[in-house]
């Protein structure tokens, strides 16, 4: 059986501008103890991806700095679909000079994903990266799904993720 991984960002993917604006316009809370509340429509699309592919989730969002346990606690508290197995490492340090290291800051997530795959994935693993920013390595482009931060994961994007993960 082929291992499948979903590298998942939150802001602009599950936490959408549309849903935040909707909650604010209704005078309802748009945050809980974990942060911004995720858009139920985006969560439903995530559920479709997980149900169809059985992919494990690796968090690439800046929320990862809260730690893996905090991410897993939030997943359980919010009854989110799938299983968060890890967070990507932080390979870009604030003390680094990106220019001196030949690293483009816009590719930092891509470097972290590449490092995670090297350290953890078995050969021939399938993966997708879902993010609202182009923050990947060129070699990861075939695995990349770019969301509109206002809409997050849509039906069309979920279908693409399913096709990529299921081959």
Q: What role is predicted for each listed range?
A:
Residues 1, 64, 149-153:
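Short, exposed beta-strand "edge-strand" segments with a Pro/Gly-rich flavor and a Y/T-containing core
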Residues 1-3, 123-124:
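Alpha-helical hydrophobic/aromatic positions enriched in membrane-embedded helices and signal peptides
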Residues 3-96:
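Alpha-helical substrate-recognition element adjacent to the catalytic core
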């Amino acid at each position: 059986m082929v291992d499948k991984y979903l590298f998942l960002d939150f802001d602009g993917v599950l936490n959408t501008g549309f849903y935040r604006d909707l909650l604010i316009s209704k005078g309802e809370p748009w945050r809980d103890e974990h942060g911004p509340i995720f858009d139920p429509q985006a969560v439903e699309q995530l559920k479709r991806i997980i149900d169809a592919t059985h992919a494990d989730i690796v968090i690439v969002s800046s929320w990862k700095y809260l730690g893996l346990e905090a991410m897993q606690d939030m997943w359980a508290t919010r009854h989110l679909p799938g299983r968060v197995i890890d967070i990507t490492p932080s390979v870009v340090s604030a003390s680094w000079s990106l220019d001196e290291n030949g690293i483009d800051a816009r590719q930092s997530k891509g470097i972290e994903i590449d490092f995670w795959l090297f350290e953890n994935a078995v050969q021939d693993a399938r993966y997708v990266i879902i993010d609202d920013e182009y923050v990947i390595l060129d070699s990861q482009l075939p695995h990349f799904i770019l969301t509109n931060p206002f809409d997050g994961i849509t039906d069309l994007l979920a279908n693409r993720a399913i096709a990529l993960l299921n081959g």
